Amino acid sequence: MPHNHGIAGSSSTFGKDHDLWHDTTFSLSEIIAYSYSPATVPVYAEDGYISTVIALARHADSFGTSNGNHITQTAAYARTLGKKLGCSAEDIVTLSLAGLLHDVGKAFIPEAILTKPGGLSATEWMIMQQHPVLGVRILRPVVKLSPALPIILSHHEHYDGSGYPNKLSGEEIPFGARIISVVDAFTTMTNGRVYQKEMTREEASLELVRCSGKQFDGFVTEAFLEILKEEKN
């Protein structure tokens, strides 16, 4: 095993509570994300709830992407990379769920922001940065998803500490989140967004190399690049 801790890391990853929508007018998202009442979903209802939130994640994925396959590809690559890095079977299931649900919080971001072709304003960018927190709040009632929550919360943290929402760095970032970060970036670049033309696999690979050790964990990046080379061959 290349690491001595689980893919989700410490529960302290969640940090303090967040005032998500301070000084904004998007109260509907606040109501949906904050007022969800059940502390937990009954065990018998968990699978149905998970199916619903996966459908919600697919809906969010359809905005601003060229083909809506981003989360499916992210989950598949996360499984493959997890296996290569020696993760347990249980952790690979968690990575797959995190890959499918990492952007579910975007379902509560205004469509005008998700589909905006130009750069976001400072306020819009602040709102966009809350999607990992919103996602965790929606998923938290499902006990079965608990191992995936720190990964989903931290998948936009950067290895150098410049990411969001908690400015974690290095091994403070859950190992699973470092995996999702790399594969999420690759599938985003190769699928394209409304604000970014899709890249070739070669172009996206070069971008991963450029950002290795800064945005991404270098060890995880190297392992993923090996997977891409194996696919090419």
Indicate where each model-derived feature is located.
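Short, intrinsically disordered low-complexity segments enriched in Ser/Thr with adjacent Pro
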Residues: I7-D17
